[in-house]
Structure formats: structure tokens, C-alpha cells
């Protein structure tokens, strides 16, 4: 009788893979959820498309046109996918040969770049950021041989700061003719002046990731975009699933990207930024908080005394934050999503009560 298990039949890299620990996967029984950088309240939409008996468009035209207009690019420079996470994976599948090519990213940063590469069997190279969380361009240059895709998150998750645009330009020159540079702009709505969308004409190897999960308040929709030149988009179209977006998703996304939807999104951003500044000011006055870092996003990174104890104490009170202790250079750090004023007050009151 065979002793081979089902797990033995799996690919070796999958057997050894640690899955991405999303906020939902980590669980918790809270009523103040400040661990996934979501918008704190639901936005209502009504479905207008009832043709659920038919397969959806592969790339829904109305939605693509709306997003292109919003982002300031041409429709042929836009690809829509199941969240920006699918865009991360599509770029690896289109440009990296498993067992031969590599991706490169700069921790501390978003965890899905490595998970996507490892799932596909592509090598991951890391160049930790400098002390100010900016790019180590010399370190990147030293490791570029064999790298096909470089991921840079700006503003960076979880640190919250923008990458210096001059460093981005240097990176794009270093990689010209060698690799695709991916600017992950999931949080760009909170600092739109910093977008690289206007650089696409200058850099044919630039790709930009976007999402409706943050400022558009549609994390449950799973809808993201890749902005790139048409040559890149055409390659991604070869590896994307035939029907990546369901009809209801495309319907709601098109509404969110209407002129009224854009106005509503910008009002949400204004409100979140005001709440962020309130929370930052309060955190700076709390004894257990050692340092509060500047943020260009809808979350705040802070360093705490006895951060693990603080994290657990708030968890036990139903306040769920994101522990960043295991990330390089983030010892003692917790990430706090900016929520409602009531949620901010719950966090402030709980932290003030900490005896550490």
C-alpha cells in the first residue's frame, strides 16, 4: 500500500509556503477593527445590471473608461483585476520564468509580493530600506542581475511614508531594458499629488497598481487596477483569467468611479486625513507610545513600550490592531487604521489606561 500522502503530491514550494496572514485570516473577536486599512463604514450601492445569466466582459468597458479618466491615462493603459493582489501575481506570471528569474522588493513592506512569487516558484530578493525607509539604491543595483520585476510600495505599507520621487527615477533608469518596476499605489488617494501615473509615457517598463479597497471604501468588492503601457497590458491580458470580474463587481465599480462617486471618495479622504491628524496628536501624548511616525495614508505606525502586551491588552478589549513586530526594523511597532472618531477614542482611552 502506498505511503504517499496528498501533501507529498503537492509542489515542494507550496508544501514549504507560509500563506499570507491577512487581517481576516488572523481573526479576532473585536468590535473595533483597525487592522486592515479599510474604510470604517459601509457605502451603499444598488445593482443596475441584472444580466447574471450571461458571462461578464473580460475587461468591462464602462469601468475601464471611468478609471482611465479618473487616473489621467488612456483606456488601453488600464487592466482591471480581482484586487491589486491579482495584479501583483499577473506581473510575475507574465515576466518571470520560475526557477530562473527573480523579483525584488524592499522590506518592511507589503507581504503579498513574496507570497505571490513563492507560489509561482520565482526567487525573492530583498534589499531592506535605509533607516528613513527610503530605497537603498546601491543595494538594489548590486542585486538586479536576473531580477525581472521590482516592487515598490508608495506610500509604503506599513510605514506610511512616500518614496522619494528622485529615487524612483534613479530606479527606473537602473532597470531600463532589464526589469519591470511596479509602483504599488494602493493608498495614493490620500496623497494624489505623488502618483507616478504621469510617468508612463517616459518609462515603458513602469507599472502601477491601484485598488478600490481603501479610499473608495470597497474592500469587500475585490477590485483593482494595473496601469501600464499598452505593451505591458497586452502581455498581462494573456495570463489573466477569462472573466476576472463578476457583473455585480463591475456594476458597483463603475458607479464608484462616476463623477459623483469620485466626489464622494474625495470627501471620505478629507474626513480620514482630519481624523488621522487628530489620532496622531493624541497618540503623541500617551505614555506607552514611544514614537509616532508621519503618515500619508489611512493608517498610522507607532512604536510602543511593551508592544506585545499592549497589542494583546487591546485585542482582549475588542480593539484589533496590526502587529508589525516581525517586520525588519519595526520592532515594537503596531499599525493602527484610521477609523471613526468613536473608534479613535476607544483606542486613545485604552492606550491611556495601559500601565507599562
UniProtKB/Swiss-Prot annotation:
Origin species: Escherichia coli (strain ATCC 8739 / DSM 1576 / NBRC 3972 / NCIMB 8545 / WDCM 00012 / Crooks)
Presence of the UniProt keyword Calcium in the record: no
Highest classification ranks of the organism: Bacteria, Pseudomonadati, Pseudomonadota, Gammaproteobacteria, Enterobacterales
Protein name per the record: Histidinol-phosphate aminotransferase
Pfam families in the record: Aminotran_1_2
Family note: Belongs to the class-II pyridoxal-phosphate-dependent aminotransferase family. Histidinol-phosphate aminotransferase subfamily.
Keyword terms of this UniProt record: Amino-acid biosynthesis, Aminotransferase, Histidine biosynthesis, Pyridoxal phosphate, Transferase
TM spans (from-to): none
Residues with the N6-(pyridoxal phosphate)lysine modification: 214
GO molecular function (one): pyridoxal phosphate binding
Reaction catalysed by this enzyme: L-histidinol phosphate + 2-oxoglutarate = 3-(imidazol-4-yl)-2-oxopropyl phosphate + L-glutamate
Cofactor: pyridoxal 5'-phosphate
GO biological process assignments: L-histidine biosynthetic process
Enzyme Commission number: 2.6.1.9
SUPFAM superfamilies hit by this protein: PLP-dependent transferases
Assembly: Homodimer.
HAMAP family on file: HisC_aminotrans_2
Annotated metabolic or biological route of this protein: Amino-acid biosynthesis; L-histidine biosynthesis; L-histidine from 5-phospho-alpha-D-ribose 1-diphosphate: step 7/9
Amino acid at each position: 500500500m502506498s505511503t504517499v500522502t496528498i501533501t507529498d503530491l503537492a509542489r515542494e514550494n507550496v508544501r514549504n509556503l507560509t500563506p499570507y496572514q491577512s487581517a481576516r485570516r488572523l481573526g479576532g473577536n473585536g468590535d473595533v477593527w483597525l487592522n486592515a486599512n479599510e474604510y470604517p463604514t459601509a457605502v451603499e450601492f444598488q445593482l443596475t445590471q441584472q444580466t447574471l445569466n450571461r458571462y461578464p466582459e473580460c475587461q468591462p468597458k464602462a469601468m475601464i473608461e471611468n478609471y482611465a479618466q479618473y487616473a489621467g491615462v488612456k483606456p488601453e493603459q488600464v487592466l482591471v483585476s480581482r484586487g491589486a493582489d491579482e495584479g501583483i501575481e499577473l506581473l510575475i506570471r507574465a515576466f518571470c520564468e520560475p526557477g530562473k528569474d527573480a523579483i525584488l522588493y524592499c522590506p518592511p513592506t507589503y507581504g503579498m509580493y513574496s507570497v505571490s512569487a513563492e507560489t509561482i516558484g520565482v526567487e525573492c530578493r530583498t534589499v531592506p530600506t535605509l533607516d528613513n525607509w527610503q530605497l537603498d539604491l546601491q543595494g538594489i543595483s548590486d542585486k538586479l542581475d536576473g531580477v525581472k520585476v521590482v516592487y515598490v510600495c508608495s506610500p509604503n505599507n506599513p510605514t506610511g511614508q512616500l518614496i522619494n520621487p528622485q529615487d524612483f527615477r534613479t530606479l527606473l533608469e537602473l532597470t531600463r531594458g532589464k526589469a519591470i518596476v511596479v509602483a504599488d499605489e494602493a493608498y495614493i488617494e490620500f496623497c494624489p499629488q505623488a502618483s507616478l501615473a504621469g510617468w508612463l509615457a517616459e518609462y515603458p517598463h513602469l507599472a502601477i497598481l491601484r485598488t478600490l479597497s481603501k479610499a473608495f471604501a470597497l474592500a469587500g468588492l475585490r477590485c483593482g487596477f494595473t496601469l501600464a503601457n499598452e505593451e505591458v497590458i497586452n502581455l498581462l491580458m494573456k495570463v489573466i483569467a477569462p472573466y476576472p470580474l463578476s457583473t455585480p463587481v463591475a456594476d458597483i465599480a463603475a458607479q464608484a468611479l462616476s463623477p459623483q462617486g469620485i466626489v464622494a471618495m474625495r470627501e471620505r479622504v478629507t474626513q480620514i486625513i482630519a481624523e488621522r491628524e487628530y489620532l496622531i496628536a493624541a497618540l503623541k501624548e500617551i505614555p506607552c507610545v514611544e514614537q509616532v511616525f508621519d503618515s500619508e495614508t489611512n493608517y498610522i505606525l507607532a512604536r510602543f513600550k511593551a508592544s506585545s502586551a499592549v497589542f494583546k491588552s487591546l485585542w482582549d478589549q475588542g480593539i484589533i490592531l496590526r502587529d508589525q513586530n516581525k517586520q525588519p526594523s519595526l520592532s515594537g511597532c503596531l499599525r493602527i487604521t484610521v477609523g471613526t472618531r468613536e473608534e479613535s477614542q476607544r483606542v486613545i482611552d485604552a492606550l491611556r489606561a495601559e500601565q507599562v
